Amino acid sequence: MNDQAPVAYAPLWRTAWRRLRQRPFQYILLVLGIALGVAMIVAIDVSSNSAQRAFDLSAAAITGKSTHRLVSGPAGVDQQLYVDLRRHGYDFSAPVIEGYVLARGLGNRAMQFMGTDPFAESAFRSPLWSNQNIAELGGFLTRPNGVVLSRQVAQKYGLAVGDRIALQVKGAPTTVTLVGLLTPADEVSNQKLSDLIIADISTAQELFHMPGRLSHIDLIIKDEATATRIQQRLPAGVRMETSDTQRDTVKQMTDAFTVNLTALSLIALLVGIFLIYNTVTFNVVQRRPFFAILRCLGVTREQLFWLIMTESLVAGLIGTGLGLLIGIWLGEGLIGLVTQTINDFYFVINVRNVSVSAESLLKGLIIGIFAAMLATLPPAIEAMRTVPASTLRRSSLESKITKLMPWLWVAWFGLGSFGVLMLWLPGNNLVVAFVGLFSVLIALALIAPPLTRFVMLRLAPGLGRLLGPIGRMAPRNIVRSLSRTSIAIAALMMAVSLMVGVSISVGSFRQTLANWLEVTLKSDVYVSPPTLTSGRPSGNLPVDAVRNISKWPGVRDAVMARYSSVFAPDWGREVELMAVSGDISDGKRPYRWIDGNKDTLWPRFLAGKGVMLSEPMVSRQHLQMPPRPITLMTDSGPQTFPVLAVFSDYTSDQGVILMDRASYRAHWQDDDVTTMFLFLASGANSGALIDQLQAAFAGREDIVIQSTHSVREASMFIFDRSFTITIALQLVATVVAFIGVLSALMSLELDRAHELGVFRAIGMTTRQLWKLMFIETGLMGGMAGLMALPTGCILAWILVRIINVRSFGWTLQMHFESAHFLRALLVAVVAALAAGMYPAWRLGRMTIRTAIREE
């Protein structure tokens, strides 16, 4: 027989096709294992890319063709600068007011609001206006509170020119009039306009309370010389940045979030690899006598190798294709969860369309096929190296597994040490950390065979005394088929350990956050403007409300806070700043580092001696402890501020700078108040005070008055909602593991049909057969569950102490609950028992004569 390419050797392919028709269920399991793993990766990619594209489109609608823009502090840019630029011949400049509003008349959703000068727009955002005759939009310039929308949005909500639209701008209710409809030239422009309201610059200044100020000035600069000349004319506190700066900043904000989701989906794929390995191994083991006959007839080792590899390649292609389709479908469902999390923690975004990129599909295709080939390689090599005589012996593979035991311990030590080294390496590289995490997980999975053998051999005598011969047979059967059972146990262990690890890490985060909220938010009443999303307030409190509430009877102290973003030149990005008039924790705030005496910290802080940094800020900027003074761009130029302390904070993974309000007002000329924290006098009742304030401000939509307890509950609700995706990933990994156990038990059932047929022939009842199967599956599930507990704890420690710190900069306290461990054991045992029901049913219905007949 000639050694020819496997694809050209028709008889071998006919045997493979007959095998597929005889045992379709095994190949279905193989395809499912690949499909589910690929689906999760593609789903995460699709949902993340859709959110990123939605932001890119909304940013492009604002940015247009501008190459640079001039920006300043929280109060914006003085519009006189725009006038001066025009006077000096810089015609490629345009004023912009930009912000988010809650469009109550447009589905009660957050939308971008842009104020522009239509006469300066042609060079910047012409695609939005290309099909529009500005002369027909006279009301755009002359009508008070006149706005324009895309024709598609207006039709969706049944609006016509002249209709009024209710908005909430910076927390204050207002009404605008639709004075015109935009008809974009193409679909991309239409998508850009789907979440955009446009008004004249003067209308926007009035609505956003920015008289004489601009959010930024857009520029089109074609050479460096022009950029240099403009920069030389800029007043103190104004800077020039490229138009891509905001997009890059946003991408950096969400990178850690996306990487963490992708890593969790890879764990589901890792469980799928175990399933593929288990299924292919069984296919090889079951066909060993047939392969021996083929080898005797002259089929070469290489032909057997390529037959097995190509079978898996075909299954991998089918599974990957199915996984891509499922992933796109799941991605559509995950978009809402991903978008909500981004809205809660980062920025406002609305995703209208699913974005499926070629890169996402190619990534899923490569990963799926690579996973299938990687998992198939060991059994294919084993089949290739086995000589015909040993191939005919059923015990040869199991004897090899027994000889392999010491080497599995060596591999466990080597791979585990490599993983620990990767985790130990300093730096904030998440990819290195996840390589270490996966190395440790695979190392722990490698010891499943020796541990299973060790435990089962010691359980057999005890179970024999307790349950009789069947109790002794069950653990011994697991050991006799260790090449299949140990892989199924490892797959289930990986899935359940993911459940334990993520549950502990999420529980630790939740408990740490709850404790932090309890000690940090010590005020009795919280006053704020309404929010666009579940995140921080979008506007500021009315001046009259601040004045009246701070003097309200029963209020001992009113701490005022102002949230804003300022530019840090040394870090090249805007940072979040919170200016406060006092300590909202009433002296209970936890600190990571303090300069000097803690008792004098707040007196020094309120005297303007320095600022405080949150722990994530220190981590994100890789600052040394103690941190050096930081530089911030103020209205009068860059100013340096000493750092007095580093405090614990879980409100933002981007970091927060805490500054006293007096210093903030002096440097940025900003008297606005975003929120108020009210401390009541002794004997005052918070419920009664809230009722009084709500009655006094009844009918006003620009003030929200609630107890601090309600704020804590809302924070915990947002936290729980943000981890919904994680729970979904856990579920998929468990489903894949369930399929793996089912595959292993089906393999054992087919492989042991002759043996069990003999047992039935000598008197074993169907009831005893069911009992044997359930003891075996229960032992496998229990073993997987017991191994998953320490593995899950190790995974949780890595997630909490390393991955979390590198991703978000938060230090969390490990928190263990017995419920996590009990639930994991229950899931492992129940999954194994459930997977054993179908094989037990099949065995119970088998014909004894057929089962005991040898070929």
Curated annotation (Swiss-Prot):
The record's principal subcellular location, in a coarse class, is membrane
Q: Name one GO molecular function term.
A: transmembrane transporter activity
* Residues of the signal peptide: none
> Cross-referenced InterPro entries, in alphabetical order?
ABC3_permease_C (IPR003838), MacB_PCD (IPR025857), Membrane_comp_ABC_pdt (IPR038766)
Q: What does the induction field say? A: Highly up-regulated during the early stages of invasion of the human blood-brain barrier.
Q: Which domain of life is it from?
A: Bacteria
Q: Which residues cross the membrane?
A: 24-44, 256-276, 318-338, 361-381, 404-424, 430-450, 487-507, 725-745, 780-800, 821-841
Phenotypic consequence of gene deletion: Disruption of the gene reduces the ability of M.tuberculosis to bind to host cells. Disruption does not reduce virulence in a mouse model of infection. Invasion of the infant human brain microvascular endothelial-cell monolayer is significantly decreased in transposon mutant.
Which Pfam families has this protein been placed in? FtsX (PF02687), MacB_PCD (PF12704)
Give the record's subunit note: The complex is probably composed of two ATP-binding proteins (Rv0986) and two transmembrane proteins (Rv0987).
> What does the record give as the function of this protein?
Probably part of an ABC transporter complex involved in host cell binding either through secretion of an adherence factor or through maintaining the architecture and integrity of the mycobacterial cell envelope. Could be required for host endothelial-cell invasion and/or intracellular survival.
Question: Would you identify the family this protein belongs to, as annotated?
Answer: Belongs to the ABC-4 integral membrane protein family.
**Name of this protein:** Uncharacterized ABC transporter permease protein Rv0987
Q: Which organism is it from?
A: Mycobacterium tuberculosis (strain ATCC 25618 / H37Rv)
